[in-house]
């Protein structure tokens, strides 16, 4: 099983990365392979609604980190998205990233529930 952890912070090794690394370590203790994917610090455009991803192109017409993620995500069993919180919401780049990834990724990005282990009660 593989879980892709997405760092939506413009700071590759900041607080969001630390939180994702902690989550990754817990998953790895359960035998889950993890990979942290940083969206980077370059601007990420929002969806322009052209529909190219649905009309045979098979990916977003805006060629950036979103297409790279969708390819990796198609092979993953689950995702964890981490983002700094700005004014009670995720950052703009992360919002645009997720909108485009889930739309252009189509069925490969559909919700798939996974179960890792039984919770323990104390």
Would you name each region that the model predicts?
Residues 101-113:
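Short, acidic/small-residue loops that bind anionic groups at enzyme active sites
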Residues 112-122:
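Residue-level detector of conserved catalytic or cofactor/ligand-binding positions
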Residues 1-104:
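N-terminal beta1-alpha1-beta2 submodule of the flavodoxin-like/Rossmannoid cofactor-binding fold
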